[in-house]
Amino acid sequence: MAGDGQDVRTYDVELTTLLGKRSGSLGVRLSGECFSGVLRLMKQENPVQGQLSPDGQCRLTGSIRTRMGAYPFEGEGHLLPECLEMILRCGGFPLPLRGNRREE
């Protein structure tokens, strides 16, 4: 979005869980050092928010909704223009989240 200082990105992601890998997407809207977005997994839309440093290190929070309930998480890792790699800590379990930016 030219002129408003925001950058919109969509990543195709894979979350590694205790029950296997789950594919989805992460859409983010960056504004300065903050971002918000939606993590789409298991047919659910999960709002997320976080902070991003100039070198790509990030922290994010949100929750993952399933048929069984909602599971809050905190994550950290790297959110780069071309890819992302993070660890989400959910219920004491580390869940790797990796992905590549979708061509738009």
Q: Predicted segments — roles?
A:
Residues 2-104:
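Central antiparallel beta-sheet cores of small beta-barrel/beta-sandwich binding domains
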